[in-house]
């Protein structure tokens, strides 16, 4: 069931996409994190903002 309400879409995007991902262990961290919560590495990247496209 796709979302049509713009307010709900905004909430979902904030919860899903505004994260940082550790390049060493793959753990999700908060956007304000400077070190990984799992392996304590400082090698973090922002999570990709696009959903993967489905292949036919």
Swiss-Prot record:
Keywords of this entry: Ribonucleoprotein, Ribosomal protein
Q: Which SMART domains would you find in this protein's record?
A: Ribosomal_L40e (SM01377)
- Read off the InterPro entries from this record: Ribosomal_eL40_arc, Ribosomal_eL40_dom, Ribosomal_eL40_sf, Ribosomal_zn-bd
Biological process (GO), any one: translation
**Does the keyword section mention Ubl conjugation?**
no
Q: Per UniProt, what is one GO molecular function of this protein?
A: structural constituent of ribosome
Pfam families xref list: Ribosomal_L40e (PF01020)
Keyword Ribosomal protein assigned: yes
The entry's cellular-component GO terms read: ribonucleoprotein complex; ribosome
Tell me which NCBIfam families the record gives.
Answer: PRK04136.1 (NF003161)
Q: Which family does it belong to?
A: Belongs to the eukaryotic ribosomal protein eL40 family.
HAMAP family cross-referenced by the UniProt entry: Ribosomal_eL40
**Name the UniProt record assigns to this protein:** Large ribosomal subunit protein eL40
Q: Kindly list the organism's lineage.
A: Archaea, Thermoproteota, Thermoprotei, Sulfolobales, Sulfolobaceae
């Amino acid at each position: 069931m796709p979302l049509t309400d713009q307010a709900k879409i905004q909430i979902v995007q904030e919860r899903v996409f505004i994260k940082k991902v550790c390049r060493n262990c793959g753990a999700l961290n908060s956007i304000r994190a400077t070190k990984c919560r799992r392996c304590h590495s400082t090698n973090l990247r922002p999570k990709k903002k696009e959903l993967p496209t489905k292949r036919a």
